[in-house]
């Protein structure tokens, strides 16, 4: 059995397969998943699992070079934004896009991780870095 915090097989496998510059999106329950992009659906009930818990678990295994957020997040300030700020040292450089541009970016993702989060704009695109 694994020693790290992340137990979900599909998510762990996806992270292990990421290369430098690959994109992994963590999204709220309402974020559309583009056709052809793998969906890792963790949603169980509204709010479970929440965005922040999934982000922490992903960061336990993923090296992140930079991250992208929707500009609308700054106006709504969902609870996940507090966690993003707390984890900023593990997230690299920040970029802001409109929510529509964020959805276009998600077309290039290796996978979208769907959480049970129901707070608007609780989405982040993580761009993989390297550990060397």
From Swiss-Prot:
<dbReference type="GO" id="GO:0019303">
    <property type="term" value="P:D-ribose catabolic process"/>
</dbReference>
<feature type="binding site">
    <location>
        <begin position="121"/>
        <end position="123"/>
    </location>
    <ligand>
        <name>substrate</name>
    </ligand>
</feature>
<keyword id="KW-0413">Isomerase</keyword>
<feature type="binding site">
    <location>
        <position position="28"/>
    </location>
    <ligand>
        <name>substrate</name>
    </ligand>
</feature>
<dbReference type="InterPro" id="IPR023064">
    <property type="entry name" value="D-ribose_pyranase"/>
</dbReference>
<comment type="similarity">
    <text>Belongs to the RbsD / FucU family. RbsD subfamily.</text>
</comment>
<feature type="active site" description="Proton donor">
    <location>
        <position position="20"/>
    </location>
</feature>
<dbReference type="GO" id="GO:0016872">
    <property type="term" value="F:intramolecular lyase activity"/>
</dbReference>
<comment type="function">
    <text>Catalyzes the interconversion of beta-pyran and beta-furan forms of D-ribose.</text>
</comment>
<dbReference type="GO" id="GO:0062193">
    <property type="term" value="F:D-ribose pyranase activity"/>
</dbReference>
<feature type="binding site">
    <location>
        <position position="99"/>
    </location>
    <ligand>
        <name>substrate</name>
    </ligand>
</feature>
<dbReference type="InterPro" id="IPR023750">
    <property type="entry name" value="RbsD-like_sf"/>
</dbReference>
<dbReference type="InterPro" id="IPR007721">
    <property type="entry name" value="RbsD_FucU"/>
</dbReference>
<comment type="subunit">
    <text>Homodecamer.</text>
</comment>
<dbReference type="Pfam" id="PF05025">
    <property type="entry name" value="RbsD_FucU"/>
</dbReference>
<dbReference type="GO" id="GO:0048029">
    <property type="term" value="F:monosaccharide binding"/>
</dbReference>
<comment type="pathway">
    <text>Carbohydrate metabolism; D-ribose degradation; D-ribose 5-phosphate from beta-D-ribopyranose: step 1/2.</text>
</comment>
<keyword id="KW-0963">Cytoplasm</keyword>
<keyword id="KW-0119">Carbohydrate metabolism</keyword>
<protein>
    <recommendedName>
        <fullName>D-ribose pyranase</fullName>
        <ecNumber>5.4.99.62</ecNumber>
    </recommendedName>
</protein>
<dbReference type="GO" id="GO:0005829">
    <property type="term" value="C:cytosol"/>
</dbReference>
């Amino acid at each position: 059995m694994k020693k790290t915090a992340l137990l979900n097989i599909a998510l762990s496998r996806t992270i292990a397969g990421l290369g430098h510059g690959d994109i992994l999106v963590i999204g709220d329950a309402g974020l559309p998943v583009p056709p052809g992009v793998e969906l890792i659906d963790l949603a169980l009930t509204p709010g479970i699992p929440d965005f922040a818990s999934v982000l922490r678990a992903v960061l336990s295994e993923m090296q992140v070079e930079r991250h992208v957020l929707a500009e609308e997040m700054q106006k709504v300030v969902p609870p996940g934004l507090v966690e993003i700020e707390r984890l900023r040292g593990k997230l690299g450089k920040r970029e802001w896009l409109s929510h529509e541009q964020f959805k276009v970016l998600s077309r290039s993702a290796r996978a979208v991780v769907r959480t049970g989060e129901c707070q608007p704009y609780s989405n982040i695109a993580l761009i993989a870095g390297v550990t060397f």
